[in-house]
């Protein structure tokens, strides 16, 4: 059975998620490891006996990718997945915004797999991960589904109007994301957002994303 563990990043309280199915293997996927110190994540991985195979970034901002460098050092086989725009942006401390939070900031190496180049899908032990571009919060953004879970990064956060004023954000693209998410309703998807609590997509008023 597919399981998802939510772990709060620190010091910024963004969400990291671990996707796993121990009935298949001990491999797992880490989504948005944004902690300066990965202690909480590492404790969970050790407790469950899990080994990260992939890291997926929903977008480039530092509070969603801060832990990537250390993960790559600790787990040498792990592969980073994100959009091509995200891959470019994480290489710049200005574009990933880390320099504005804490001098001197940090930079990441490029992604190992760019979502644009794998036809927006990934077969992971017979679970199909479907990616979609979601460029309201940032042009680098992506949302994706696996099983009954929908990972939205900062494109969709419960009861929060989506922030579009940062670099490459777009109100017009956000409207497209609202339409995309409306079409996903009716499938019993659980939303795993970039901040805050997990919630059910079918029960949520998506107009809150754009302040209606």
Name every feature range the model reports, one short phrase each.
Residues 1-48, 142-153:
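Conserved beta-strand hairpin/beta-sheet module of binuclear metal-dependent hydrolase folds
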Residues 2, 50, 78-79, 127-129, ...:
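A structural micro-motif
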Residues 7-8, 112, 132-135:
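Short Gly/Pro-enriched turn/cap motifs at secondary-structure boundaries
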Residues 28-32, 54-57, 131-133:
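Short catalytic-loop micro-motif centered on adjacent basic/acidic residues
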Residues 29, 56, 80, 151-152, ...:
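Residue-level marker for buried hydrophobic side chains located in beta-strands
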Residues 35-121, 209:
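Active-site HxH/HxHxD metal-binding segment of metal-dependent hydrolases
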């Amino acid at each position: 059975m597919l399981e998802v563990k939510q772990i709060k990043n620190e010091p910024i309280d963004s969400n990291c998620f671990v996707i796993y199915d121990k009935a298949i293997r001990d491999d797992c996927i880490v989504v948005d490891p944004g902690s300066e110190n990965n202690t909480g994540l590492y404790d969970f991985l050790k407790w469950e006996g899990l080994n990260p195979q992939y890291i997926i970034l929903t977008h480039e901002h530092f509070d969603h990718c801060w832990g990537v460098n250390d993960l790559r050092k600790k787990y040498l086989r792990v592969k980073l997945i994100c959009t091509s725009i995200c891959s470019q942006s994480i290489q710049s401390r200005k574009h990933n915004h880390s320099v504005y939070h804490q001098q001197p900031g940090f930079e990441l190496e490029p992604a190992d797999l760019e979502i644009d180049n794998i036809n927006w899908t990934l077969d992971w032990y017979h679970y199909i991960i479907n990616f979609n571009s979601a460029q309201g919060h940032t042009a680098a953004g992506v949302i994706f589904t696996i099983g009954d879970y929908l990972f939205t990064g900062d494109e969709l956060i419960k009861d929060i109007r989506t922030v579009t004023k940062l670099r490459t954000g777009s109100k017009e693209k956000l409207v497209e994301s609202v339409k995309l998410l409306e079409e996903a309703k009716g499938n019993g998807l659980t939303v795993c957002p970039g901040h805050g609590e997990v919630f059910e997509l079918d029960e949520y008023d998506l107009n809150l994303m754009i302040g209606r």
